[in-house]
Amino acid sequence: MIADVKKSAEQKMQKSLDALKVDFSKVRSGRPHTGLLDHIMVDYYGTPTPIKQLANVTLADARTIGIIPWDKKIFSAIEKAIRDSDLGLNPMTVSDMVRVPMPPLTEERRKDLTKIVKTEAEAARVAMRNIRRDANAHLKELLKDKLIAEDEDRRAQDEIQKLTDRYIAEVDKLLQTKEAELMAV
């Protein structure tokens, strides 16, 4: 029973951490990466479709993402989807490729993005603490129903606290890495 509570808490914390990683990957830093466009949906004959299902997304050079669509009729739809996204990018079509140059971030924009990632990290920490609270409440129920002893309850709560501390440290590490990436010129 205690093992189930711990396992459930750990799985939920891992899911929260994975969600944070996905959120961080959507925040644009100074250098391009192909995952930056993963969440952009293109209107493909009336159906919103992820850009990676319609084209090859590659790094053309150190400051440019290259998109080579498989259907040559959707260049304008891809450009429009990227322009309408909140990334602040200005794509252009060059022969058979949509080129997305990555302008350098201004100092003000870097600070705004840093605030955003700090907020996302804090939300992940709160989620971890809520998972801990739910696990501890479940342990209290088991104790109340006399399914576990008090010392088992205390030991399990300590283990869940260690688990929470470990995942929160992981969140802090991800935040530090992302902040350094954002502030690098």
Swiss-Prot record:
Any one cellular-component term (Gene Ontology): cytosol
One MF term in the entry's GO annotations: ribosomal large subunit binding
InterPro entries associated with the record: Ribosome_recyc_fac, Ribosome_recyc_fac_dom, RRF_sf
Intracellular or extracellular location(s): Cytoplasm
Function: Responsible for the release of ribosomes from messenger RNA at the termination of protein biosynthesis. May increase the efficiency of translation by recycling ribosomes from one round of translation to another.
NCBIfam families attached to this UniProt entry: frr
Protein name: Ribosome-recycling factor
Annotated source species: Nitrosomonas europaea (strain ATCC 19718 / CIP 103999 / KCTC 2705 / NBRC 14298)
The encoding gene: frr
